[in-house]
Amino acid sequence: MTVDILAFGAHPDDAEIGCGGLLLKLKDRGYRTGIVYLTVGEMGSRGTPEIRRQELTAAAKALGLDYMEVMDFQDCRVVDDFDSRLKIACVVRQQRPTIVLAPYWDGPPGRGVGHTDHQAAGYLVSHGVNFAHLRALPLESEPHSVSNLLYYLFPRELPPSFVVDISDYIDQWVEVLKCHHSQFYNPETTHYDFVDTLVAVARARGVSIGARYAQGFIAPEPLRVDDPFMLVTPRRRTPQYPT
């Protein structure tokens, strides 16, 4: 079986953070969804590889994914080279998604969004998606052309190309995030502090479109629109001040 939308994450929890709400929404609408984790996050400060595998499996179940794969790249050593692109292209050919999601490829280097693996994964998946349609490459499976490549986990100061309302899925999304207990639970406060931060970001993004919660995405090229009225949706009232 193939999927309609396939998200690539450098580590367990990347895709859940950046596009988990979208995946829940699309799954609810009947689309087939999947996530490919490049690494098991073995260099993380908390959580062993075994624990991380258990957590990503739980998250995949909570998301209702139709496909999930953990590849054999090394944490903090994800590289965009020819052989790695072939690996990504193989997955794309096998799963044949219409849309591919990947971490954004640029931004201030360092922790979080600027993690070296996030940026490398952005380049790697972009080139792998391109390789997937090239017939001359020595790959199994028939060539496949992805219709749209979209990016998540981009610097907050960058404007998104479009924003998706995930208000109806916010509670489910939070439960998905909590599956990654080793990463999000703060034993010093006995609370999921980082989850609260992510919800606040989604709240801010939602306000920008008149929704309660939303997630934004960047498209590398203009998105074709045949009927602008298909883009028009009623704005939810999101009061910020007493009236």
Task: Show where each model-derived region lies.
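Metal-dependent de-N-acetylase/amidase catalytic core
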Residues: 1-6, 82-243
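Active-site rim/loop-helix segments in enzyme catalytic domains that contact anionic ligands
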Residues: 1-96, 230-237
